[in-house]
């Protein structure tokens, strides 16, 4: 069997606007390789309570069927696009929150100890604390950062951090508070309680409002509508309340090469559902 090369590279399917030379919020705040450094710094997170035993994860070397329609947008007819077509990549790589039986019985004689990796996963209910520092951010940039860290304030939106995201690990809730340097930061060393930290609790909603106002003023009505739709879909995929749905595991399961239905998805080039289709929002 011979592989036929595509006329277009993968990079040609990335929307041109994403290859723009205009500096966006992400590049401005987190740096751009050798051009300029980051103004946001992640410190270590510390576990508030202890954890003892390690678990052994299942080997993740099995083949998973895939096809190009998983990665490209479909046309107006709903048919799958091809790499030679003038179609864009579907979007960003994100993972659903899911419950997976990723543990492997250590007494299982069929497991290959050479490919099984021991690690200490975060157990449910544990809490980490830490700081994310920033410097020289404008009010709009600070609002953008605060907005990202406040997506989980609704109590049902969880983030994905660390390893094991594809198998259901790394789902965490974040509660962020904003602290700002006050006028005494460089002038006062001691306070009645001891050393003066020189910081005070800030109003993150104030800066989030500044950021949202900036977006409303800078984006065209069409771009703003598209932005709001993407934020809506982001909330859908971050929503961990779906885990209470008895059919959720089947909806978000990976394709299996031994499953006839999954083979049909690839063989017949059936486009995968959108986020809204998965959560039945349309």
Specify the residue positions occupied by each region the protein language model found.
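Basic, Gly/Ser/Thr-rich N-terminal segments that form RNA-phosphate-binding interfaces in CRISPR RAMP
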Residues: 1-282
């Amino acid at each position: 069997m011979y592989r036929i090369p595509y006329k277009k590279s993968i990079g040609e399917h990335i929307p041109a606007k994403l290859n723009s030379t205009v500096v966006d919020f992400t590049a401005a705040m987190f740096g751009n390789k050798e051009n300029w450094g980051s103004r946001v710094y992640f410190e270590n997170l510390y576990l508030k309570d202890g954890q003892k035993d390690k678990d052994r994860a299942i080997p993740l070397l099995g083949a998973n069927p895939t096809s190009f329609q998983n990665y490209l947008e479909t046309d107006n007819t709903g048919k799958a696009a091809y790499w030679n077509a003038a179609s864009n990549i579907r979007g960003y790589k994100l993972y659903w929150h899911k419950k997976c039986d990723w543990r492997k019985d250590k007494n299982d004689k069929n497991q290959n100890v050479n490919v099984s990796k021991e690690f200490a996963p975060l157990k449910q209910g544990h809490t980490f604390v830490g700081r994310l520092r920033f410097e020289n951010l404008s009010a709009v940039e600070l609002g953008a950062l605060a907005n990202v860290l406040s997506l989980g304030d609704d109590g049902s939106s969880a983030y994905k951090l660390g390893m094991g995201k594809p198998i259901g690990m790394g789902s965490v809730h974040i509660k962020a508070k904003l602290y700002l340097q006050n006028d005494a930061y460089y002038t006062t060393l001691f306070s009645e309680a001891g050393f003066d930290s020189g910081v005070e609790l800030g109003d993150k909603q104030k800066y989030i409002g500044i950021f949202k106002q900036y977006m409303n003023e800078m984006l065209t009505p069409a771009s703003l509508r598209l932005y709001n739709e993407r934020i809506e879909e982001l909330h859908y995929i971050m929503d961990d309340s779906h885990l209470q749905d008895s059919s959720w595991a089947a909806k978000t399961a990976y394709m299996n090469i031994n499953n006839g239905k999954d083979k049909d998805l690839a063989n017949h080039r059936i486009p995968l559902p959108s986020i809204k289709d998965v959560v039945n929002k349309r």
